[in-house]
């Protein structure tokens, strides 16, 4: 299935690229999320008419993400207070939702999907470096402190 990308998609292409993807990926993910349209003659003509508008919207999203990344960089640390047991082990764990809620409580809106924890949830008291991916091209590392209650 050939599609035209309406926004930048990681490891696939940028706005306006005509790419070949598996039918299921195009039908079930790219098209419903508004990231692409099927590459038919009429859609290609419609896209060319809207190209400048779509590129401007993509640029605006990136600029907004860079602004949020700057706010995250200005804030030195984010702290989460959690209940702990013996030897600094947490009761439960700290996951992406907890981190996103802590950052949002400090005034910077972040969704849980933007928080990247490649090693999985955090289960001990301490300092951690966590990546926040605000846009395909914009990632900001933050310092997260998990303290005992």
Curated annotation (Swiss-Prot):
SUPFAM superfamilies: L9 N-domain-like, Ribosomal protein L9 C-domain. GO terms for cellular component: ribonucleoprotein complex; ribosome. The keyword Iron does not apply. It comes from the Bacteria. It holds the Pfam family Ribosomal_L9_C. GO terms for biological process: translation. The keyword Ribosomal protein applies. Disulfide bonds: none annotated. PANTHER family: 50S RIBOSOMAL PROTEIN L9. Belongs to the bacterial ribosomal protein bL9 family. This is Large ribosomal subunit protein bL9.
């Amino acid at each position: 299935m050939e599609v035209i990308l309406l926004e930048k998609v990681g490891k696939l292409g940028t706005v306006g690229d005509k790419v070949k993807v598996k039918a299921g990926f195009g039908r079930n993910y790219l098209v419903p999320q508004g990231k692409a349209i099927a590459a038919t003659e009429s859609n290609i003509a419609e896209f060319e008419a809207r190209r400048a508008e779509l590129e401007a919207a993509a640029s605006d999203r990136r600029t907004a993400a860079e602004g949020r990344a700057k706010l995250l960089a200005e804030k030195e640390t984010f702290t989460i207070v959690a209940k702990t047991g013996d030897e600094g082990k947490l009761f439960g764990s700290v996951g992406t939702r907890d981190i996103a809620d802590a950052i949002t409580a400090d005034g910077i809106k972040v969704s849980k999907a933007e928080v990247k924890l490649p090693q999985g949830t955090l289960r001990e008291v301490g300092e951690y470096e966590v990546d926040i991916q605000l846009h395909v091209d914009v990632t900001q590392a933050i310092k997260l402190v998990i303290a005992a209650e």
